[in-house]
């Protein structure tokens, strides 16, 4: 997915109140913008870091700039939590994830469960309806290991329970972790930061929920799917090795 119009480079001054950040543009102008990420963003808020912003016009917008990318640990990392849904939908629609391919319809943000919305609903007259929950991942503590969540997420545990309900009802239920960085070659659930989520994850696996981890190639010009990676979890560590992304390279 290309960034159009092009992103604006800047230097991060501070991220605060979860939804706001201050930055210095290359012109020297200091701006305040919107941070579309409610997580802790551990390791991704260092003052002085090189960042990239999208720019939006509109009389109803309070802030013109949106925090999209940051340079951290020698790589470019996506922080906008809306991007993984778009990347996943694009990859599935193009047939780049073989096990989620061949569906005639890919719909986004459909009502289901307990007053929730499923990120992607895949339907086809000849196939089982598939519910896909997408989670944004950018947390890395160990080299090469992507982890989720980076803080306690009650909503995340609820989503796993609802996916389990769909599996119990005879549908396919999929948790797709989209990793907005290219320097990770494996994924695991971060149980030490959220034991409730880790427990819900194990329960979802036993109920038949499928789990995949898709890493992305991120640059200031575009975000593209770069391959499915193994999951460090008993019983599913090799799950993703069967499937390839056609755009991988």
Swiss-Prot record:
Annotated protein name in UniProt: Sugar fermentation stimulation protein homolog
MF-aspect GO terms: DNA binding
Similarity comment text for this entry: Belongs to the SfsA family.
Domain of life where this protein originates: Bacteria
PANTHER family: SUGAR FERMENTATION STIMULATION PROTEIN A
Pfam families, per the entry: SfsA, SfsA_N
Gene3D superfamilies found in the cross-reference section: 2.40.50.580, 3.40.1350.60
The encoding gene: sfsA
Organism of origin: Rhizobium rhizogenes (strain K84 / ATCC BAA-868)
């Amino acid at each position: 997915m290309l960034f159009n119009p092009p992103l604006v480079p800047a230097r991060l001054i501070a991220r605060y109140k979860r939804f706001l950040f201050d930055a210095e543009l290359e012109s020297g102008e200091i701006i305040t913008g919107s941070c579309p990420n409610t997580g802790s963003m551990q390791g991704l808020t260092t003052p002085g870091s090189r960042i990239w912003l999208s720019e939006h016009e509109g009389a109803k917008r309070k802030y013109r700039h949106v925090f999209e990318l940051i340079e951290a640990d020698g790589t470019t990392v996506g922080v906008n939590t809306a991007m993984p849904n778009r990347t996943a939908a694009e990859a599935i629609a193009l047939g780049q994830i073989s096990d989620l391919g061949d569906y005639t319809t890919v719909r986004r943000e459909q009502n289901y469960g307990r007053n929730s919305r499923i990120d992607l609903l895949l339907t086809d007259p000849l196939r089982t309806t598939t519910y896909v929950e997408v989670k944004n991942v950018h947390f890395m503590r160990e080299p090469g290991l992507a982890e989720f969540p980076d803080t306690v997420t009650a909503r995340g545990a609820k989503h796993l329970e609802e996916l389990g309900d769909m599996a119990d009802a005879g549908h396919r239920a999929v948790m797709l972790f989209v990793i907005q960085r290219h320097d990770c070659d494996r994924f695991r659930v971060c149980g030490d930061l959220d034991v409730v989520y880790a427990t819900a994850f194990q329960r979802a696996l036993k109920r038949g929920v499928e789990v995949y981890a898709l890493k992305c190639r991120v640059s200031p010009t575009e975000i593209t799917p770069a391959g499915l990676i193994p999951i460090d979890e008993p019983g599913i560590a090799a799950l993703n090795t069967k499937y390839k992304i056609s755009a991988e390279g």
